[in-house]
Amino acid sequence: MNIKGVNLGNWLVLEKWMNPALFEGTTAEDEYYLPTQLSPEVYEARIKIHRSEYITERDFVTIKRMGMDSVRIPVPYFIFGDRKPFIGCIEELDKAFNWAEKYGLTIFTLYR
């Protein structure tokens, strides 16, 4: 079985090297330390904007048009929002599953 896919990294699990602007004004090197160096309001605003804009339905359309058949989505351990101060992201993952189904893509997840 051949799989043609793409990794949707830095959407639900942040990678500083892929989007340093999210870490602006901090010395945090990863998502674990980011909320300790920002006010709760600033942290929440950055995360919500990032998640709503970084990967969208349009990306799933593009992935399908490029001939891909699958996407890999790294998923954080705080996906359900039960690990303060982190903000859950199950709603975004639900959207991804809906978009994948709509465009005939398979999803692989990576739990962290």
Regions found by a protein language model. Name each.
Residues 1-68:
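N-terminal carbohydrate-binding accessory modules
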Residues 57-112:
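Substrate-binding cleft and catalytic face of glycoside hydrolase catalytic domains
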